[in-house]
């Protein structure tokens, strides 16, 4: 009888783990910022890689937590040069997962993001850090869908819409790079990815 509690203690982590689904994924970003003045901007292709953890439930509704490394930003053209701005974020989405069938799932929710790096690659001034010109914290809404064609493999797409301004406020009359927004600009990202669910 004394062995029973010991066996329960040993088997409990395995039971809990069996009730949790883990997934990994990687893909491409089509990133841009909202309308700005002072320069022409265009969408930029980046990458995303990350994973998620979710309860292994068969219910219609469930929750999912993710962590994603995401390269975003934009291409730009001014009167004097062209280049691209790379904004690297750690995204932490918290999602409601709606399971329509074994093949199709839809996710929606919110996310917070932390800026890890900000750099420019310019024809006029070479490369350099832009970390002081962009906010360290972002937040917004996300929504998308995933298809599970076979086994644990899945493909998906998602739209990320930021609600916070990506750039810091430019000082009145002060110097400011002509390829960094002076007014409120927000990140917009479309993600396409593939992954595996364990």
Locate each region found by the language model.
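Bacterial Sec-dependent N-terminal signal peptides
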Residues: 1-25, 194, 198
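Outer-membrane beta-barrel channels and translocator barrels
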Residues: 17, 56-60, 101, 150-152
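Transmembrane beta-strands of outer-membrane beta-barrel proteins
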Residues: 22-26, 63-65, 106-110, 143, ...
């Amino acid at each position: 009888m004394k062995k029973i509690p010991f066996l329960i203690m040993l088997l409990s982590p395995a039971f809990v783990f069996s009730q949790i689904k883990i997934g990994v994924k990687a893909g491409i970003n089509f990133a841009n910022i909202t309308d700005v003045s002072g320069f022409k901007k265009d969408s930029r292709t980046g990458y995303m890689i990350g994973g998620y953890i979710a309860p292994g439930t068969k219910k219609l509704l469930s929750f999912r937590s993710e962590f994603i490394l995401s390269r975003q930003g934009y291409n730009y053209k001014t009167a004097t040069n062209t280049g691209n701005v790379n904004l690297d974020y750690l995204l932490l989405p918290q999602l409601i997962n709606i399971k329509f069938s074994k093949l199709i799932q839809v996710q929606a929710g919110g996310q917070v993001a932390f800026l890890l790096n900000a750099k420019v690659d310019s024809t006029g001034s070479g490369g350099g850090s832009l970390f002081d010109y962009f906010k360290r914290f972002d937040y917004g809404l996300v929504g998308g869908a995933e298809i599970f064609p076979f086994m644990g493999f899945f493909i998906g797409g998602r739209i990320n819409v930021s609600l916070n301004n990506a750039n810091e406020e430019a000082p009145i009359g002060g110097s400011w790079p002509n390829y960094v927004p002076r007014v409120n600009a927000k990140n917009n990202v479309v993600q396409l990815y593939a992954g595996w669910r364990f």
